[in-house]
Amino acid sequence: MKLSIDWLALFLGSWITSVQSMCPTILEPAYPAPSLAAGWSAQLIAQGLSRPRTILFDTNGGLLILQQGVGIAHIKWTDDGSTCLQNPVQTIVVGSTVVLTNDDSTTRSLLTTKLTPNQLLISRGTTLNIDPEAELPSTGHCQLKSFNLSTLTPESPPYNFTTSGHLLATGLRNSVGLAEEPLFGGIYSVENGPGNMTRNNIDIHLYNPGEELNFHGYLNGSSENQGANYGFPYCFAVWNELDVGGGLRVGDQFSMVQNKSSNDTWCNNVEVHVAPKLTFAAHSAPLDMIFLANGTEAFISFHGSLETTPPVGYRISSITFNPTTGLPTSPSTSTISTSDIISNSNSSFCPGNCFRPVGMALDGLGRLFVSSDATGEIWVVVRMGSVG
């Protein structure tokens, strides 16, 4: 046995040395390197950024990076294939942070759609744990809307989020990640639930409510789910069934109290509220979502939280989709709908000294680029054998 172990160690050491020799510039993180699922490889390709979050490729293959206190930067690498991207050259594209200043966390996310052109989706959240104003559509709180850009002219006044646009959803506390399913154009969001949750005055916050994957229909004329209420600020997704009780299952919606105006029956009335397509662990904090072009898989970045011990999230996970329906393959009651791609082997270093993913972007070769805001980094993650 010792001989075989020694041989394996020698083989792996030689293989790693070979890979590094093919890519002479290897950046190393200042913390334990993330763990990878079988069949995947990853490499740190940029350091020293200022809390990078949203990332997006331009038409020339450069990566646009939104950085806190900096603005928008553009980075281009020497591309030697697979995870070997070297010599990053950074240019500040937008250096004024004034144009990006936001006094709170209301308007959080933007998405331009492809299958229905000229539509800009905007998700507006809340700074509050529980926001009573979200109950009233007229406030504009906790909503997802689409805006038609084709009707704008240089003389047009700017859209007013509260009074303009096409309402896709209400009752979304903080749906930061938005994605368009590439084959049918279905609109999805990932929802961050509140903390400090109680039910009938009993603390259940460690494992409830769950984070959510919500479906908002299509922009091509179908009205399925559009304008629907997804529950917040009164109804929340079950993650831990035992803590919630009441015979509810994962993905059902529960009320914090049981009275005539707010109760579990009302929360689960499909004529009133739309339940999530999938539910994820409480406090895992999903912040971005992106689909493969063939519609078979989507990736979600879980930013993570310290609400539980050990901390949860701090990972990129995948969800399988049915390309003939544009819907997840897992049932809404599943607790195992995600498969981790890259995560931290020891989350005790989190949040300040570990991989903490936020934004994601896929390049033309199918490589997944990820920002880690806590560490000021960009990583590239590759399914082995999928690119040269």
Language-model regions: role of each:
Residues G48-G61, V94-Q119, L167-P182, V274-E297, ...:
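Beta-rich, blade/repeat-based domains predominating
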Residues H74-L100:
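Blade-loop segments of beta-propeller domains
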Residues M1-Q20:
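Fungal secretory targeting signals
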